Amino acid sequence: MKLFARLTLLVLVIPFIAKSQSQPEWENENINYINREKARNSWMPYASEEQAVTENLSLSPYYLNLNGTWKFNWVKHPDLRPVNFFQPGYDVSWWDNLEVPSCWQLKGYGIPVYTNVTYPHAAKPPYIMEPVPAEFTKHQYPNPVGSYVREFVLPANFKDRRTLLHFAGVESAMYVWVNGVKVGYSEDSRLPAEFDITKYVRSGKNTLAVEVYQWSDGSYLEDQDFWRMSGIYRDVYLLSVPGTYLRDYWLKADFVSDFSKAELTLEAGFAGFSLKEKLNLEVYLLLYGQKNEKLPDPVFSFAIDGGKTYKAPLIHKASISNPRLWSAEDPNLYHVLIVTKNKAGKVLMVQSSDFGFRKVEIKDQQLWVNGKSIKIKGVNRHDIDPTDGRAVSKASMLRDVELFKQFNINTVRTSHYPNDPYFYNLCDRYGIYVIDEANVESHGMGYGDESLGHVKSWQEAHVSRIMNMMERDKNHPSVIMWSLGNEA
């Protein structure tokens, strides 16, 4: 009897295993990424305080912009894609040139698709290649794939450091190769994908290859009321960081009752303790006020013992007297520099980001900022441009923020997904409250038991999109509310 039961179980399980193994990542809701770095707050690395206070990345030797002209091939069906295009020596010289960032539909490849509730593909999650009615655009273009290739020269000062490859936005799923070696996979069209490519790069010339799928299982969570466009549509760049480095930090402030004093808390998470060479580090947090006026002393400093592994974030606190408060009416910003040095005093990296002292709370059935009740006068904003689609320029974002201020709008909801990181910087600087919304919308599946929010196998995909948004944007003073999604 036991043998019969085991054989029966085996017969039931084997087809499931075979099906799982035969599913590509872009049709598997349980695989949202492979080898992608954990989400982190937005920061940029510099070599000195002087560089960092300018916020001019062109001065940083630890930043390499990969925007520009890439070789590009487009097909309408995955079976037609150039399967081995990432291999060294593969001839892409005859391919088209495509500017990155951009949406390929606006460059003559395929057709932009607009729909609201109804999915532009068959509603049979997680599958994307199921047949659709003849009137669907997807009937003509089942699942276009864009293959991107470009070369880059690794800067000499990246040597003996970690190299991170950062994609700020790619729709909807992608595979990445460096020098012919597969690096990883990522979904979620509205948040960054970052990969540690240290072991894949070499001195001199390198080749980066990216394969982008227009539709994936992730598309089931991206059923917003908008135009669907695809490709590498936000910035791509390389960052150089020390072998052991401050990977993520969270700055928080609490206040005494009259706001005359703030307690600043830093939660610092480090990475790179697997290195054979153990580094002892000194870390300093500096604050710069208006006109880059530096506060006289480091807010706090602490040491990192290279012989230890720090699994939990390190927490440090400091008292700040009479901080200038941030609000939409008076957006006072401080420039935060976090300096990492080795024991010999050599600066290994300076990380730069803005910070605002403010307190948000709900009491007496009202929303309060810095001890004063406020009234929301808000709009919804899609991150889109009439000419460039998803590849929204900094100038276009600035025009939106200026219009908000001119019309006395004090709040924007990033409907219905996280926007470009630069947009939050503008809201910080100009004074716009932000309701930050996760890239979760699946109303094409309805709201009953069939809703993907009720399906256990989709839980990780939902939660990761929410958490990764929060991790990226947690230090922006403009973000006063989190939205877990829309119509999902």
Regions found by a protein language model. Name each.
Residues 25, 37, 56, 73-75, ...:
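Accessory beta-strand-rich segments of carbohydrate-active enzymes
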Residues 178, 261-303, 314:
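Beta-strand-rich binding/interaction modules
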Residues 209-211, 335-339:
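Extracellular recognition modules
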